[in-house]
Protein backbone atom coordinates (compact mmCIF):
# COMPACT_ATOMS: atom_id res chain seq x y z
CA UNK A 1 0.00 0.00 0.00
CA UNK A 2 2.82 2.34 0.91
CA UNK A 3 4.60 1.56 -2.37
CA UNK A 4 1.46 2.51 -4.23
CA UNK A 5 1.25 5.86 -2.43
CA UNK A 6 4.90 6.54 -3.24
CA UNK A 7 4.26 5.80 -6.90
CA UNK A 8 1.22 8.08 -7.02
CA UNK A 9 3.17 10.82 -5.28
CA UNK A 10 6.03 10.46 -7.71
CA UNK A 11 3.67 10.67 -10.68
CA UNK A 12 1.90 13.69 -9.18
CA UNK A 13 5.15 15.54 -8.46
CA UNK A 14 6.60 14.58 -11.80
CA UNK A 15 3.63 16.01 -13.67
CA UNK A 16 3.73 19.30 -11.79
CA UNK A 17 7.48 19.70 -12.05
CA UNK A 18 7.32 18.74 -15.74
CA UNK A 19 4.68 21.37 -16.34
CA UNK A 20 6.69 24.06 -14.57
CA UNK A 21 9.95 23.12 -16.28
CA UNK A 22 8.28 22.77 -19.67
CA UNK A 23 6.57 26.15 -19.34
CA UNK A 24 9.84 27.79 -18.25
CA UNK A 25 11.71 26.14 -21.12
CA UNK A 26 9.16 27.31 -23.70
CA UNK A 27 9.22 30.87 -22.33
CA UNK A 28 13.04 30.96 -22.45
CA UNK A 29 13.16 29.60 -26.03
CA UNK A 30 10.46 32.04 -27.22
CA UNK A 31 12.30 34.93 -25.56
CA UNK A 32 15.59 33.96 -27.22
CA UNK A 33 13.97 33.58 -30.64
CA UNK A 34 12.05 36.85 -30.32
CA UNK A 35 15.15 38.75 -29.26
CA UNK A 36 17.28 37.29 -32.04
CA UNK A 37 14.74 37.84 -34.81
CA UNK A 38 13.81 41.36 -33.71
CA UNK A 39 17.35 42.56 -33.16
CA UNK A 40 18.75 41.04 -36.36
CA UNK A 41 15.85 41.89 -38.63
CA UNK A 42 17.04 43.54 -41.85
CA UNK A 43 16.71 47.31 -41.46
CA UNK A 44 14.93 49.25 -44.20
CA UNK A 45 17.36 50.86 -46.67
CA UNK A 46 17.67 54.48 -45.60
CA UNK A 47 18.69 56.29 -48.79
CA UNK A 48 18.23 59.69 -50.36
CA UNK A 49 17.94 60.62 -54.03
CA UNK A 50 19.06 63.59 -56.09
CA UNK A 51 18.55 64.66 -59.71
CA UNK A 52 20.98 66.70 -61.81
CA UNK A 53 20.22 67.88 -65.34
CA UNK A 54 23.26 68.62 -67.50
CA UNK A 55 22.12 71.26 -69.99
CA UNK A 56 25.03 71.16 -72.43
CA UNK A 57 25.58 73.04 -75.66
CA UNK A 58 24.38 70.19 -77.90
CA UNK A 59 21.99 68.20 -75.67
CA UNK A 60 20.55 67.78 -72.18
CA UNK A 61 20.99 64.70 -69.98
CA UNK A 62 19.27 63.80 -66.70
CA UNK A 63 21.10 61.82 -64.02
CA UNK A 64 19.58 60.30 -60.90
CA UNK A 65 21.84 59.62 -57.92
CA UNK A 66 21.30 58.04 -54.53
CA UNK A 67 23.30 57.87 -51.30
CA UNK A 68 22.88 56.63 -47.71
CA UNK A 69 21.14 59.17 -45.49
CA UNK A 70 23.98 58.73 -42.98
CA UNK A 71 27.08 60.23 -44.58
CA UNK A 72 30.80 59.52 -44.42
CA UNK A 73 32.84 62.42 -43.04
CA UNK A 74 30.01 64.79 -44.03
CA UNK A 75 29.95 63.78 -47.72
CA UNK A 76 27.45 61.36 -49.18
CA UNK A 77 28.61 58.13 -50.81
CA UNK A 78 26.79 58.75 -54.08
CA UNK A 79 26.09 56.34 -56.94
CA UNK A 80 24.34 56.82 -60.28
CA UNK A 81 21.19 54.75 -60.82
CA UNK A 82 19.72 56.30 -63.98
CA UNK A 83 20.68 58.30 -67.06
CA UNK A 84 18.17 59.76 -69.50
CA UNK A 85 19.12 61.73 -72.61
CA UNK A 86 16.61 64.36 -73.70
CA UNK A 87 15.71 64.31 -77.38
CA UNK A 88 16.61 67.50 -79.18
CA UNK A 89 19.29 70.22 -78.96
CA UNK A 90 20.69 71.93 -75.90
CA UNK A 91 18.44 74.47 -74.18
CA UNK A 92 20.34 77.33 -75.82
CA UNK A 93 18.79 76.13 -79.09
CA UNK A 94 15.34 77.20 -77.84
CA UNK A 95 16.03 80.92 -78.17
CA UNK A 96 13.30 81.27 -80.80
CA UNK A 97 10.92 78.67 -79.37
CA UNK A 98 10.99 79.07 -75.59
CA UNK A 99 7.40 77.86 -75.28
CA UNK A 100 8.50 74.36 -76.40
CA UNK A 101 10.81 73.79 -73.42
CA UNK A 102 8.00 72.30 -71.31
CA UNK A 103 7.41 69.49 -73.83
CA UNK A 104 11.18 69.11 -74.30
CA UNK A 105 11.70 68.11 -70.64
CA UNK A 106 8.53 66.04 -70.15
CA UNK A 107 9.88 62.57 -70.98
CA UNK A 108 12.94 62.71 -68.74
CA UNK A 109 11.09 64.21 -65.77
CA UNK A 110 8.35 61.59 -66.02
CA UNK A 111 11.05 58.94 -66.10
CA UNK A 112 12.48 60.36 -62.86
CA UNK A 113 9.05 60.06 -61.24
CA UNK A 114 8.99 56.35 -62.03
CA UNK A 115 12.55 55.60 -60.87
CA UNK A 116 12.36 57.39 -57.50
CA UNK A 117 9.86 56.01 -54.94
CA UNK A 118 6.82 58.31 -54.81
CA UNK A 119 7.08 58.61 -51.03
CA UNK A 120 10.45 60.39 -51.53
CA UNK A 121 9.51 62.72 -54.39
CA UNK A 122 8.94 65.75 -52.16
CA UNK A 123 12.34 65.44 -50.47
CA UNK A 124 14.37 64.73 -53.64
CA UNK A 125 16.34 67.81 -54.79
CA UNK A 126 16.52 68.67 -58.51
CA UNK A 127 19.28 70.84 -59.92
CA UNK A 128 19.80 72.01 -63.50
CA UNK A 129 23.23 73.24 -64.49
CA UNK A 130 23.68 74.86 -67.89
CA UNK A 131 27.20 74.90 -69.31
CA UNK A 132 29.11 76.59 -72.15
CA UNK A 133 26.23 76.78 -74.64
CA UNK A 134 24.26 78.97 -72.26
CA UNK A 135 27.40 80.85 -71.19
CA UNK A 136 27.81 81.87 -74.81
CA UNK A 137 24.15 82.81 -75.19
CA UNK A 138 24.34 84.93 -72.03
CA UNK A 139 27.24 86.86 -73.55
CA UNK A 140 25.37 87.33 -76.82
CA UNK A 141 21.88 87.95 -75.41
CA UNK A 142 21.53 87.96 -71.61
CA UNK A 143 17.80 88.67 -71.75
CA UNK A 144 17.18 85.60 -73.88
CA UNK A 145 19.36 83.40 -71.65
CA UNK A 146 17.37 84.54 -68.59
CA UNK A 147 14.11 83.86 -70.43
CA UNK A 148 15.16 80.29 -71.25
CA UNK A 149 16.24 79.60 -67.65
CA UNK A 150 12.92 80.96 -66.39
CA UNK A 151 11.04 78.65 -68.77
CA UNK A 152 13.13 75.69 -67.62
CA UNK A 153 12.48 76.54 -63.96
CA UNK A 154 8.75 76.86 -64.60
CA UNK A 155 8.65 73.48 -66.35
CA UNK A 156 10.58 71.55 -63.68
CA UNK A 157 8.62 73.20 -60.85
CA UNK A 158 5.47 71.44 -62.09
CA UNK A 159 6.85 68.09 -60.92
CA UNK A 160 6.59 66.88 -57.29
CA UNK A 161 10.29 67.24 -56.52
CA UNK A 162 12.25 69.73 -54.42
CA UNK A 163 13.42 71.98 -57.27
CA UNK A 164 16.57 73.87 -56.25
CA UNK A 165 16.87 76.10 -59.30
CA UNK A 166 18.29 76.29 -62.80
CA UNK A 167 21.48 78.23 -63.30
CA UNK A 168 24.45 78.63 -65.59
CA UNK A 169 27.50 77.12 -63.89
CA UNK A 170 30.88 78.72 -64.45
CA UNK A 171 33.64 77.10 -66.46
CA UNK A 172 35.66 76.75 -63.26
CA UNK A 173 32.84 74.86 -61.58
CA UNK A 174 32.42 72.58 -64.58
CA UNK A 175 36.11 71.72 -64.54
CA UNK A 176 36.31 71.25 -60.78
CA UNK A 177 33.20 69.06 -60.56
CA UNK A 178 34.56 66.89 -63.37
CA UNK A 179 37.76 66.49 -61.36
CA UNK A 180 35.76 65.45 -58.29
CA UNK A 181 33.88 62.84 -60.34
CA UNK A 182 37.03 61.28 -61.80
CA UNK A 183 38.76 60.94 -58.46
CA UNK A 184 35.66 59.79 -56.61
CA UNK A 185 35.03 56.97 -59.09
CA UNK A 186 38.69 55.94 -58.99
CA UNK A 187 38.56 55.74 -55.18
CA UNK A 188 41.02 58.56 -54.52
CA UNK A 189 39.00 60.30 -51.81
CA UNK A 190 37.87 57.63 -49.38
CA UNK A 191 38.80 54.18 -48.16
CA UNK A 192 35.34 53.24 -46.93
CA UNK A 193 33.52 52.11 -50.05
CA UNK A 194 31.47 49.30 -48.54
CA UNK A 195 28.20 50.86 -49.70
CA UNK A 196 29.50 50.51 -53.23
CA UNK A 197 30.66 46.95 -52.40
CA UNK A 198 34.09 47.83 -53.73
CA UNK A 199 37.50 46.70 -52.58
CA UNK A 200 39.04 49.59 -50.59
CA UNK A 201 42.41 50.93 -51.55
CA UNK A 202 45.27 50.26 -49.18
CA UNK A 203 47.19 53.37 -50.21
CA UNK A 204 45.75 56.36 -48.38
CA UNK A 205 48.33 58.72 -49.84
CA UNK A 206 47.87 57.95 -53.53
CA UNK A 207 47.77 61.00 -55.78
CA UNK A 208 44.62 62.28 -57.39
CA UNK A 209 44.06 62.25 -61.15
CA UNK A 210 43.77 65.37 -63.27
CA UNK A 211 40.63 65.87 -65.38
CA UNK A 212 40.37 66.79 -69.07
CA UNK A 213 36.88 67.64 -70.33
CA UNK A 214 35.92 68.49 -73.91
CA UNK A 215 32.42 69.64 -74.80
CA UNK A 216 30.88 71.34 -77.78
CA UNK A 217 31.56 74.92 -76.67
CA UNK A 218 34.34 74.70 -74.06
CA UNK A 219 37.16 72.57 -72.73
CA UNK A 220 38.44 72.29 -69.15
CA UNK A 221 41.70 71.18 -67.54
CA UNK A 222 41.88 70.57 -63.78
CA UNK A 223 44.55 68.98 -61.59
CA UNK A 224 46.46 69.29 -58.33
CA UNK A 225 49.85 70.91 -59.13
CA UNK A 226 52.96 69.40 -57.63
CA UNK A 227 53.67 72.74 -55.93
CA UNK A 228 50.86 75.10 -54.94
CA UNK A 229 51.20 78.43 -56.74
CA UNK A 230 49.75 81.91 -56.29
CA UNK A 231 50.62 83.25 -59.75
CA UNK A 232 47.00 83.20 -60.90
CA UNK A 233 44.62 83.04 -57.89
CA UNK A 234 41.57 82.99 -60.17
CA UNK A 235 42.59 79.52 -61.33
CA UNK A 236 42.73 78.06 -57.82
CA UNK A 237 39.77 76.33 -56.19
CA UNK A 238 39.49 74.75 -52.76
CA UNK A 239 37.33 71.78 -51.72
CA UNK A 240 36.67 69.82 -48.59
CA UNK A 241 35.58 66.27 -49.35
CA UNK A 242 35.44 63.28 -46.99
CA UNK A 243 37.13 65.24 -44.25
CA UNK A 244 40.12 66.35 -46.34
CA UNK A 245 41.01 69.67 -48.02
CA UNK A 246 42.04 69.92 -51.68
CA UNK A 247 43.54 72.80 -53.66
CA UNK A 248 43.23 72.42 -57.43
CA UNK A 249 44.20 74.36 -60.53
CA UNK A 250 41.39 74.67 -63.07
CA UNK A 251 40.66 76.66 -66.21
CA UNK A 252 37.87 76.56 -68.75
CA UNK A 253 38.47 77.72 -72.32
CA UNK A 254 35.22 79.06 -73.74
CA UNK A 255 35.00 78.78 -77.55
CA UNK A 256 37.46 75.87 -77.56
CA UNK A 257 34.96 73.04 -77.39
CA UNK A 258 35.10 71.00 -80.60
CA UNK A 259 32.00 72.57 -82.22
CA UNK A 260 32.98 76.17 -81.59
CA UNK A 261 36.59 75.43 -82.50
CA UNK A 262 35.39 74.15 -85.88
CA UNK A 263 33.44 77.37 -86.46
CA UNK A 264 36.55 79.37 -85.54
CA UNK A 265 38.57 77.34 -88.00
CA UNK A 266 36.02 77.85 -90.79
CA UNK A 267 35.94 81.60 -90.13
CA UNK A 268 39.73 81.62 -90.32
CA UNK A 269 39.69 79.49 -93.47
CA UNK A 270 37.20 81.82 -95.15
CA UNK A 271 39.80 84.59 -95.24
CA UNK A 272 41.09 85.17 -98.75
CA UNK A 273 38.44 83.05 -100.47
CA UNK A 274 35.44 83.81 -102.65
CA UNK A 275 33.01 82.13 -100.25
CA UNK A 276 34.15 78.58 -101.01
CA UNK A 277 36.35 76.91 -98.36
CA UNK A 278 38.56 74.01 -99.40
CA UNK A 279 38.71 72.35 -96.01
CA UNK A 280 41.55 69.86 -95.32
CA UNK A 281 39.79 68.63 -92.14
CA UNK A 282 36.84 67.27 -94.16
CA UNK A 283 37.06 64.24 -96.41
CA UNK A 284 37.62 64.74 -100.12
CA UNK A 285 34.37 64.86 -102.16
CA UNK A 286 32.44 65.95 -99.09
CA UNK A 287 30.38 69.14 -99.44
CA UNK A 288 28.39 71.20 -96.96
CA UNK A 289 26.76 74.62 -96.88
CA UNK A 290 26.43 76.76 -93.76
CA UNK A 291 24.78 80.10 -93.16
CA UNK A 292 27.07 83.10 -93.30
CA UNK A 293 25.33 84.42 -90.18
CA UNK A 294 26.70 81.47 -88.18
CA UNK A 295 30.23 82.77 -88.76
CA UNK A 296 29.81 86.54 -88.62
CA UNK A 297 27.36 86.71 -85.70
CA UNK A 298 28.76 84.09 -83.34
CA UNK A 299 30.56 85.18 -80.17
CA UNK A 300 33.45 82.79 -80.77
CA UNK A 301 34.04 83.74 -84.41
CA UNK A 302 33.94 87.52 -83.96
CA UNK A 303 37.66 87.70 -83.22
CA UNK A 304 38.36 86.40 -86.72
CA UNK A 305 37.26 89.57 -88.46
CA UNK A 306 35.69 88.75 -91.80
CA UNK A 307 36.13 90.97 -94.83
CA UNK A 308 33.04 93.07 -95.53
CA UNK A 309 32.91 91.56 -99.02
CA UNK A 310 31.57 88.34 -97.45
CA UNK A 311 28.55 89.98 -95.81
CA UNK A 312 26.25 89.87 -98.86
CA UNK A 313 26.73 86.10 -98.96
CA UNK A 314 23.91 84.02 -97.48
CA UNK A 315 25.65 80.64 -97.59
CA UNK A 316 29.25 79.51 -97.37
CA UNK A 317 30.22 76.40 -99.30
CA UNK A 318 32.65 73.90 -97.76
CA UNK A 319 34.47 71.39 -99.94
CA UNK A 320 36.50 68.66 -98.31
CA UNK A 321 40.17 68.21 -99.19
CA UNK A 322 41.07 65.36 -96.81
CA UNK A 323 44.63 66.17 -95.77
CA UNK A 324 45.63 65.44 -92.17
CA UNK A 325 48.91 67.41 -92.14
CA UNK A 326 47.31 70.56 -93.57
CA UNK A 327 44.38 70.10 -91.20
CA UNK A 328 46.73 69.90 -88.24
CA UNK A 329 48.67 73.01 -89.24
CA UNK A 330 45.50 75.03 -89.75
CA UNK A 331 44.16 74.05 -86.31
CA UNK A 332 47.44 75.09 -84.65
CA UNK A 333 46.66 78.65 -85.80
CA UNK A 334 43.73 78.76 -83.36
CA UNK A 335 46.13 78.64 -80.40
CA UNK A 336 48.22 81.67 -79.51
CA UNK A 337 51.22 80.28 -77.64
CA UNK A 338 53.58 83.21 -78.25
CA UNK A 339 52.21 85.43 -75.47
CA UNK A 340 52.63 84.44 -71.80
CA UNK A 341 52.70 86.89 -68.84
CA UNK A 342 53.37 84.06 -66.35
CA UNK A 343 56.16 81.58 -65.70
CA UNK A 344 54.32 79.07 -67.92
CA UNK A 345 51.13 79.15 -69.98
CA UNK A 346 48.80 76.93 -71.96
CA UNK A 347 47.61 79.24 -74.75
CA UNK A 348 46.09 82.71 -75.20
CA UNK A 349 48.11 83.99 -72.22
CA UNK A 350 46.44 81.69 -69.66
CA UNK A 351 48.53 80.47 -66.73
CA UNK A 352 49.20 76.72 -66.59
CA UNK A 353 51.46 75.15 -63.93
CA UNK A 354 53.61 72.19 -65.00
CA UNK A 355 51.46 69.14 -65.70
CA UNK A 356 51.53 66.60 -62.90
CA UNK A 357 50.26 63.05 -62.48
CA UNK A 358 47.76 60.93 -64.37
CA UNK A 359 44.78 62.42 -66.23
CA UNK A 360 41.30 61.17 -67.02
CA UNK A 361 39.99 62.50 -70.36
CA UNK A 362 36.24 62.25 -70.88
CA UNK A 363 33.19 63.55 -72.79
CA UNK A 364 34.15 64.32 -76.41
CA UNK A 365 37.75 63.27 -75.74
CA UNK A 366 36.44 59.75 -75.19
CA UNK A 367 33.72 59.69 -77.87
CA UNK A 368 36.11 60.67 -80.65
CA UNK A 369 38.80 58.24 -79.52
CA UNK A 370 36.19 55.50 -79.26
CA UNK A 371 35.11 56.12 -82.85
CA UNK A 372 38.74 55.85 -83.92
CA UNK A 373 38.89 52.52 -82.04
CA UNK A 374 41.61 53.76 -79.69
CA UNK A 375 39.98 53.22 -76.30
CA UNK A 376 40.46 49.47 -75.89
CA UNK A 377 44.07 49.81 -74.74
CA UNK A 378 45.21 51.15 -71.37
CA UNK A 379 47.08 54.00 -73.04
CA UNK A 380 47.37 55.26 -76.61
CA UNK A 381 50.55 56.82 -77.97
CA UNK A 382 50.78 60.00 -80.01
CA UNK A 383 52.12 57.91 -82.89
CA UNK A 384 49.09 55.61 -82.84
CA UNK A 385 46.65 58.51 -82.96
CA UNK A 386 48.62 60.30 -85.69
CA UNK A 387 48.76 57.21 -87.89
CA UNK A 388 45.05 56.54 -87.41
CA UNK A 389 44.13 60.13 -88.33
CA UNK A 390 46.37 60.20 -91.39
CA UNK A 391 44.70 57.05 -92.64
CA UNK A 392 41.14 58.11 -91.78
CA UNK A 393 41.31 61.69 -93.06
CA UNK A 394 42.71 60.50 -96.41
CA UNK A 395 39.63 58.37 -97.13
CA UNK A 396 37.10 59.70 -99.64
CA UNK A 397 33.68 60.62 -98.33
CA UNK A 398 31.89 57.81 -100.19
CA UNK A 399 34.25 55.28 -98.62
CA UNK A 400 33.69 56.69 -95.14
CA UNK A 401 29.91 56.59 -95.60
CA UNK A 402 30.11 52.99 -96.76
CA UNK A 403 32.18 51.92 -93.76
CA UNK A 404 30.23 53.91 -91.13
CA UNK A 405 26.76 54.19 -92.59
CA UNK A 406 25.08 53.90 -89.18
CA UNK A 407 26.69 57.13 -87.90
CA UNK A 408 24.85 60.43 -88.41
CA UNK A 409 26.35 62.46 -91.25
CA UNK A 410 27.10 65.54 -89.13
CA UNK A 411 29.19 63.58 -86.64
CA UNK A 412 30.78 61.33 -89.25
CA UNK A 413 31.89 64.23 -91.42
CA UNK A 414 33.61 65.93 -88.47
CA UNK A 415 35.58 63.06 -86.93
CA UNK A 416 38.68 63.89 -88.97
CA UNK A 417 38.58 67.44 -87.62
CA UNK A 418 37.65 66.38 -84.07
CA UNK A 419 40.43 63.80 -83.80
CA UNK A 420 43.02 66.21 -85.16
CA UNK A 421 41.73 68.95 -82.89
CA UNK A 422 42.16 66.71 -79.83
CA UNK A 423 45.73 65.95 -80.88
CA UNK A 424 46.58 69.65 -81.29
CA UNK A 425 44.74 70.75 -78.14
CA UNK A 426 46.60 68.27 -75.94
CA UNK A 427 50.03 68.73 -77.53
CA UNK A 428 50.07 72.40 -78.51
CA UNK A 429 47.42 73.77 -76.16
CA UNK A 430 48.02 71.91 -72.89
CA UNK A 431 51.63 70.99 -73.72
CA UNK A 432 51.54 67.26 -73.18
CA UNK A 433 54.59 65.55 -74.67
CA UNK A 434 54.89 62.16 -76.32
CA UNK A 435 56.04 60.87 -72.93
CA UNK A 436 53.43 62.55 -70.69
CA UNK A 437 50.71 61.61 -73.21
CA UNK A 438 51.00 58.10 -71.74
CA UNK A 439 49.49 59.50 -68.53
CA UNK A 440 46.20 60.30 -70.30
CA UNK A 441 43.43 57.73 -69.83
CA UNK A 442 40.35 58.13 -72.02
CA UNK A 443 37.29 57.18 -69.97
CA UNK A 444 33.52 57.22 -70.32
CA UNK A 445 32.13 55.11 -67.47
CA UNK A 446 33.71 53.84 -64.27
CA UNK A 447 31.76 51.18 -62.34
CA UNK A 448 28.63 51.85 -64.42
CA UNK A 449 28.68 55.57 -63.63
CA UNK A 450 29.17 58.28 -66.26
CA UNK A 451 32.28 60.41 -65.97
CA UNK A 452 31.29 64.08 -66.13
CA UNK A 453 30.68 67.11 -63.96
CA UNK A 454 27.21 66.13 -62.67
CA UNK A 455 28.32 63.50 -60.13
CA UNK A 456 30.93 65.89 -58.71
CA UNK A 457 28.23 68.55 -58.47
CA UNK A 458 25.99 66.15 -56.54
CA UNK A 459 28.85 65.09 -54.24
CA UNK A 460 29.69 68.69 -53.43
CA UNK A 461 26.05 69.49 -52.75
CA UNK A 462 25.72 66.58 -50.31
CA UNK A 463 28.13 68.53 -48.11
CA UNK A 464 25.21 70.94 -47.63
CA UNK A 465 22.53 68.26 -47.09
CA UNK A 466 22.15 67.36 -43.38
CA UNK A 467 23.05 63.80 -42.48
CA UNK A 468 20.58 61.58 -40.66
CA UNK A 469 21.28 59.24 -37.77
CA UNK A 470 21.94 55.70 -39.00
CA UNK A 471 19.03 53.28 -38.76
CA UNK A 472 19.60 51.27 -35.56
CA UNK A 473 18.16 48.02 -34.07
CA UNK A 474 15.37 48.27 -31.43
CA UNK A 475 17.69 47.53 -28.47
CA UNK A 476 21.12 48.91 -27.63
CA UNK A 477 23.79 46.29 -28.19
CA UNK A 478 24.65 45.99 -24.47
CA UNK A 479 20.98 45.40 -23.54
CA UNK A 480 20.62 42.84 -26.30
CA UNK A 481 23.67 40.88 -25.09
CA UNK A 482 22.50 41.01 -21.44
CA UNK A 483 19.03 39.65 -22.26
CA UNK A 484 20.40 36.92 -24.53
CA UNK A 485 22.77 35.75 -21.76
CA UNK A 486 20.01 35.94 -19.13
CA UNK A 487 17.49 33.85 -21.07
CA UNK A 488 20.20 31.40 -22.12
CA UNK A 489 21.13 30.88 -18.45
CA UNK A 490 17.46 30.41 -17.54
CA UNK A 491 17.07 27.80 -20.27
CA UNK A 492 20.25 26.05 -19.15
CA UNK A 493 19.11 26.07 -15.50
CA UNK A 494 15.72 24.58 -16.44
CA UNK A 495 17.41 21.76 -18.35
CA UNK A 496 19.82 20.99 -15.47
CA UNK A 497 17.00 20.97 -12.90
CA UNK A 498 14.99 18.64 -15.10
CA UNK A 499 17.89 16.21 -15.41
CA UNK A 500 18.59 16.25 -11.66
CA UNK A 501 14.94 15.80 -10.67
CA UNK A 502 14.23 12.85 -12.93
CA UNK A 503 17.32 11.00 -11.82
CA UNK A 504 16.69 11.26 -8.02
CA UNK A 505 16.16 7.92 -6.12
CA UNK A 506 12.79 6.99 -4.62
CA UNK A 507 13.63 8.21 -1.10
CA UNK A 508 13.82 11.73 -2.60
CA UNK A 509 10.08 11.64 -3.13
CA UNK A 510 9.51 10.38 0.44
CA UNK A 511 11.46 13.30 1.84
CA UNK A 512 9.21 15.68 -0.05
CA UNK A 513 6.14 14.45 1.88
Swiss-Prot record:
Residue numbers annotated as active site: 174
BP GO annotations: nucleoside diphosphate catabolic process; platelet aggregation
EC number: 3.6.1.5
Membrane-topology descriptor: Multi-pass membrane protein
Modification after translation: N-glycosylated. The N-terminus is blocked.
Residue ranges that the UniProt entry lists as topological domain Cytoplasmic: 1-16, 503-513
Localisation: Membrane; Membrane, Caveola
Cofactors required: Ca(2+); Mg(2+)
Recorded catalytic activity of this chain's protein: a ribonucleoside 5'-triphosphate + 2 H2O = a ribonucleoside 5'-phosphate + 2 phosphate + 2 H(+); a ribonucleoside 5'-triphosphate + H2O = a ribonucleoside 5'-diphosphate + phosphate + H(+); a ribonucleoside 5'-diphosphate + H2O = a ribonucleoside 5'-phosphate + phosphate + H(+); ATP + 2 H2O = AMP + 2 phosphate + 2 H(+)
Annotated S-S bridges: 255-300, 281-327, 340-345, 393-416
Major localization listed first in the record, in broad terms: membrane
Extracellular side: 38-481
Residues annotated as transmembrane: 17-37, 482-502
Gene Ontology cellular-component terms listed: caveola; plasma membrane
Keyword Disulfide bond: yes
Family membership: Belongs to the GDA1/CD39 NTPase family.
Entry protein name: Ectonucleoside triphosphate diphosphohydrolase 1
Taxonomic source organism: Bos taurus
Amino acid sequence: MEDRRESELKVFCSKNILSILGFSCIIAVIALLALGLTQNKALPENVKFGIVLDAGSSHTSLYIYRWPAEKENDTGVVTQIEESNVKGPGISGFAKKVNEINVYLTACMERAQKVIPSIQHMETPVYLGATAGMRLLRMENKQMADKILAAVASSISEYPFDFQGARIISGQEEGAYGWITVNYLLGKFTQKLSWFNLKPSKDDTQETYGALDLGGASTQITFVPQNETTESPNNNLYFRLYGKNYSVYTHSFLCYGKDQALLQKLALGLQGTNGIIHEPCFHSRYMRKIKMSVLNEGFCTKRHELNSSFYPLVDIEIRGAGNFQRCRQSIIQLFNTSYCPYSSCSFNGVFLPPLHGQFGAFSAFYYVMEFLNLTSEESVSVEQLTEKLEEFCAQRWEEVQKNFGEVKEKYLSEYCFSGTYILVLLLNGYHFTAESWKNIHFMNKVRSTDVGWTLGYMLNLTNKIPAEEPMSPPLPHSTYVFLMVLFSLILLAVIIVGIVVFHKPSYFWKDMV
